[in-house]
Swiss-Prot record:
Phosphoprotein among keywords: no
Disulphide bridges: 134-147
Modified residues (N-methylphenylalanine): 7
Pfam families: N_methyl, Pilin
Cited InterPro entries: N_methyl_site, Pilin, Pilin-like, T4P/T2SS_Core
Quaternary structure note: The pili are polar flexible filaments of about 5.4 nanometers diameter and 2.5 micrometers average length; they consist of only a single polypeptide chain arranged in a helical configuration of five subunits per turn in the assembled pilus.
Record gene name: pilA
Keywords for this protein: Disulfide bond, Fimbrium, Methylation
Protein family: Belongs to the N-Me-Phe pilin family.
Protein name, per record: Fimbrial protein
UniProt xrefs under PROSITE patterns: PROKAR_NTER_METHYL (PS00409)
Subcellular location: Fimbrium
Any one cellular-component term (Gene Ontology): type IV pilus
Length: 150
């Protein structure tokens, strides 16, 4: 009697079914992981700008000069030290009023970020008293840890 070589059709079908089940579970989890990491990357891009804004305001630079992502004639990106396209996932916009209140926003670009984040934004809000809060339009499970307010 000859020894069997190779695999039977049923064995191959079972392996294909197992791989299909694993892929059905793994791919959505991977997409969630990507969306969460994009949120963390966006927050890491804009968080250091809080220090830049505070330092500029403390040196007496008018808030209307601390702008990026705008065509305002008073805007001077040298105060911010970052380009609006500093992160390939989207754009950064800084708008601070002369009163000191304003926002630092990261807008996720469609086609550049994952579909779960496309068109959404993370915003750092500053009050005139210098209190910063963070808000996001992302789904709650994708909001980065440093931005706790939904």
């Amino acid at each position: 009697m000859k020894a069997q070589k190779g695999f039977t059709l049923i064995e191959l079908m079972i392996v294909v079914a197992i791989i299909g089940i694993l892929a059905a579970i793994a791919i959505p989890q991977y997409q969630n992981y990507v969306a969460r990491s994009e949120g963390a990357s966006a927050l890491a891009t804009i968080n250091p700008l809080k220090t830049t804004v505070e330092e500029s305001l403390s040196r007496g630079i008018a808030g209307s000069k601390i702008l990026i992502g705008t065509t305002a004639s008073t805007a001077d990106t040298t105060y911010v030290g970052i380009d609006e396209k500093a992160n390939k996932l989207g754009t950064v916009a800084v708008t601070i009023k002369d009163t000191g209140d304003g926002t630092i926003k990261f807008n996720f670009a469609t086609g550049q970020s994952s579909p779960k984040n496309a068109g959404r934004e993370i915003t750092l809000n500053r009050t005139a008293e210098g209190v910063w809060t963070c808000t996001s339009t992302q789904e709650e499970m994708f909001i980065p840890k440093g931005c706790n307010e939904p």
